[in-house]
From Swiss-Prot:
RNA-binding component of the eukaryotic translation initiation factor 3 (eIF-3) complex, which is involved in protein synthesis of a specialized repertoire of mRNAs and, together with other initiation factors, stimulates binding of mRNA and methionyl-tRNAi to the 40S ribosome. The eIF-3 complex specifically targets and initiates translation of a subset of mRNAs involved in cell proliferation. One of its GO terms (cellular component) is eukaryotic 48S preinitiation complex. GO terms for biological process: follicle cell of egg chamber development; formation of cytoplasmic translation initiation complex; regulation of translational initiation. Belongs to the eIF-3 subunit B family. The keyword Protein biosynthesis applies. The gene is eIF3b. The lineage of its organism: Eukaryota, Metazoa, Ecdysozoa, Arthropoda, Hexapoda. This is Eukaryotic translation initiation factor 3 subunit B. The keyword Zinc does not apply. Component of the eukaryotic translation initiation factor 3 (eIF-3) complex. The eIF-3 complex interacts with pix. Interacts with mxt.
Length: 690
């Protein structure tokens, strides 16, 4: 056809020399096309009807209870309530035998195939009761497994990928700590640099552009660092911070690691609240998910110290889940009417919770042992407005800050409650003593902050007015009431930051950017009082040797950066960084040495001083030598550049003389120069005198 049109056109206009014959697109005789229909029309063929059409939205539920006809309706209501959470159910069939008794399985048809797939994903292996655990499958899966080929084909061997050593950061012979610095380079693009805090200057390990969209977070033992992205989050680790695992959860805003780094919890928003997913870190598998309402307090998960349990607070109850199955402990929640808050012990499987006052029944703080659910201590409290639970890091003590009132005022409908005559109690539970005795400390002033010494038996309190507060230090000992050991008066601090190793504390005012470093073993002397204007964060390194204060661009846009101090408050580094976001020290895993071995090392520490000091001197000498060599190299480079320019200037002398009227201006004396002063009017002012 194309050839015929070409001949007609040629006859009509034979004189048109620009016209060229159209190419012939006809296939030659015997041509065989090697492109399959799937490659050419894959998108259209995917829509053709298949034999499975009509049953892909059907699920088969096995291991349901076998009941008589009189109990069938109740069974249907229970099962339909579960399965209707994942879509509209069109049809349900419960096969029965001759006596009308169910056979232990059922068929359910959803409106859409995607709903059936979601039901299978969520309800497979769901435990209905102690004797029945669902086995839920798609109806099409039966056909798929029936068509398994009889001849077995061995799977293809995949090459083993050697994973980077995740704990190489603790193998440094000098035990230098690492930290990361994040700075926003563009909207939703954050650059993260990883550094090692070596002497005399930190060493840059790695810098990643566009590493995260918002911020980063270290895992509790420092093994992983997590980054946030639109599709979800990812964890990185190893010597070069390779991607270890990714967790698809769009819009994730916050994550939590379990204390032993076995699980990760992601929190992401939904139209009705937020979705919470618990992941297995090693496999990347989703262990369980929850959809919570908008109340963040009720949706926060708290882990036991050994990762064996995770708990959340519900309405008048605590839900405790066992790992790795994530079923409720004993398949039921713990009913606690009026519960307002709870917290795990950091070293034992003990939960502390408090219950509000109800109908003339006093408020109560309870310690419960898990998994026995045995109450090991109760403490009744009267006239309670609120409570806060503060565990000491070693688990030796629990402090309950009790906000108490002298008078309660309610409106007619009891909708608005006002507490008058507020005062505060600190109930100290001695967890390691017999029958867990409780001591009380009362303070009649406003409480601004409370902090335990992580390793030790002291706690500190900021109380009084905001601009002129007092800082009190108490010491807790066995068999006696907590004693006030020091009070620092007229301080303007708002936060307290103890060193991870105890003894030293930073009293910070994060509104004004002022800091005071205090040594609690030397009569609480203030060793230094530096300022860092607009500083909004304070970070101790894991060893308690360094402190960093930072000004984040999340708070201000000018003069962002961080300062590094020694534990005594001496400034050692100032860094101004545009759009600085956050500074985080890399955590360390707990030591493998026993307490006896640690005490022995501390006792004989003087033996190591000479070796340490010699090593420090060599390091500083090496650093000084490197600095001198660097300066010498820079000087040589400059002199080489200078000599080249002088030689070039000398070569151009004849041309300069020619351009300047055959006058050698290079050797002119200053006496031969005429100086002429030119004056001109710049401004004129008129002043009237009386």
């Amino acid at each position: 056809m194309a050839k015929k049109k070409s001949e007609e056109h040629s006859g009509a206009d034979a004189n048109d020399s620009d016209y060229q014959e159209e190419p012939n697109f006809e296939d030659p005789p015997g041509f065989v096309d090697n492109i399959s229909d799937e490659d050419l029309l894959g998108d259209m063929l995917a829509q053709r009807p298949s034999e499975a059409d009509g049953v892909e939205s059907v699920v088969v539920v096995d291991n349901i209870p076998k009941v008589e006809p009189v109990r069938l309706e109740k069974l249907k209501s229970v099962i339909n309530k579960l399965f209707s959470n994942y879509g509209d159910i069109v049809n349900v069939v419960y096969p029965v035998d001759e006596e009308g008794k169910t056979k232990g399985y059922a068929f359910m048809e959803y409106k859409q195939a995607s709903q059936a797939e979601e039901a299978v994903k969520k309800l497979n292996n769901h435990r209905l009761d102690k004797n029945h655990t669902f086995a839920v499958n798609l109806f099409t899966d039966f056909q798929k497994y029936e068509n398994i080929p009889e001849k077995w084909e061995p799977p293809t061997v995949q090459t083993f990928k050697v994973q980077s050593d995740l704990y190489n950061f603790i193998n440094d012979p000098d035990t230098y700590d690492q930290y990361c610095v994040a700075a926003e380079t563009a909207p939703n693009c954050v650059q993260v640099g990883f550094w090692q805090n070596v002497l005399p200057e930190p060493f840059e390990l790695e810098t990643r552009e566009r590493f995260t969209d918002t911020f980063v977070k270290w895992s509790p033992l420092g093994t992983y660092v997590v980054t946030f992205h639109k599709p979800g989050v990812a964890i990185w680790g190893g010597s070069s911070f390779q991607k270890i695992q990714k967790f698809p959860h769009p819009g994730t805003q916050f994550v939590e690691f379990s204390p032993c780094e076995n699980y990760l919890v992601t929190y992401g928003p939904t139209p009705t609240g937020q979705k919470i997913i618990i992941w297995d870190i090693r496999t990347g598998a989703e262990k369980r998910s929850f959809v919570a309402d908008g109340m963040s307090v009720l949706s926060m998960f708290r882990w036991s110290h050994d990762d064996k349990f995770v708990a959340r607070m519900g309405e008048n109850s605590i839900h405790i889940y066992e790992t790795p199955s994530f079923y409720l402990l004993d398949l039921k929640s713990i009913k606690i009417p009026g519960i307002r808050g709870f917290s795990w012990s950091p070293t034992d499987n003990v939960i502390a919770y408090w219950v509000e006052e109800q109908n003339q029944i006093p408020a109560r703080v309870t310690l419960m042992e898990i998994p026995k659910k045995r109450e090991i201590r109760n403490k009744n409290l009267f006239h309670v407005a609120d409570c806060k639970l503060h565990w000491q890091k070693s688990g030796d003590y629990l402090c309950v800050k009790v906000d108490r009132y002298s008078k309660l005022k309610k409106d007619k409908k009891d909708l608005d409650v006002k507490f008058l005559g507020m005062f505060y109690n600190f109930e100290i539970f001695h967890m390691r003593e017999k029958e867990i005795p409780v001591d009380s400390v009362e303070i009649r002033e406003l409480i601004l902050a409370f902090a335990w010494e992580p390793i030790g038996n002291k706690f500190s309190i900021i109380h009084g007015e905001t601009n002129s507060s007092n800082v009190s230090f108490y010491e807790v000992n066995k068999g006696v009431k907590p004693s006030l050991v020091k009070r620092l008066e007229k301080k303007s601090c708002t936060h307290l930051f103890w060193s991870p190793r105890g003894q030293f504390i930073v009293m910070a005012n994060l509104t004004m950017g002022t800091f005071e470093f205090v040594d609690s073993t030397n009569d609480y002397i203030i060793t230094s009082s530096p300022d860092h204007f607009r500083a909004s964060e304070v970070e101790w390194d894991p060893t308690g040797r360094y402190v960093v204060t930072g000004v984040s661009s999340w708070k201000v846009k000018e003069d962002t950066g961080f300062n590094m101090y020694t534990f005594q408050g001496r400034i050692i580094k100032r860094t101004i960084l545009k759009n600085f976001v956050q500074f985080l020290w890399r955590p360390r895993p707990p030591t493998l040495l026993s307490e006896e071995k640690q005490k022995e090392i501390k006792k004989n520490l003087k033996k190591y001083y000479a070796a340490f000091e010699q090593k420090d001197r060599l390091r500083l000498t090496r650093a000084s030598k490197e600095l001198l060599e660097k300066r010498s190299q820079l000087r040589e480079t400059f002199m080489e550049y200078r000599n080249k320019r002088i030689a070039e200037w000398a070569d151009q002398k004849s041309r300069r003389i020619m351009l300047r009227g055959h006058v050698d201006t290079d050797n002119l004396e200053t006496d031969e120069v005429d100086e002429e002063i030119v004056e001109f009017l710049v401004k004129e002012e008129v002043t009237l005198l009386e």
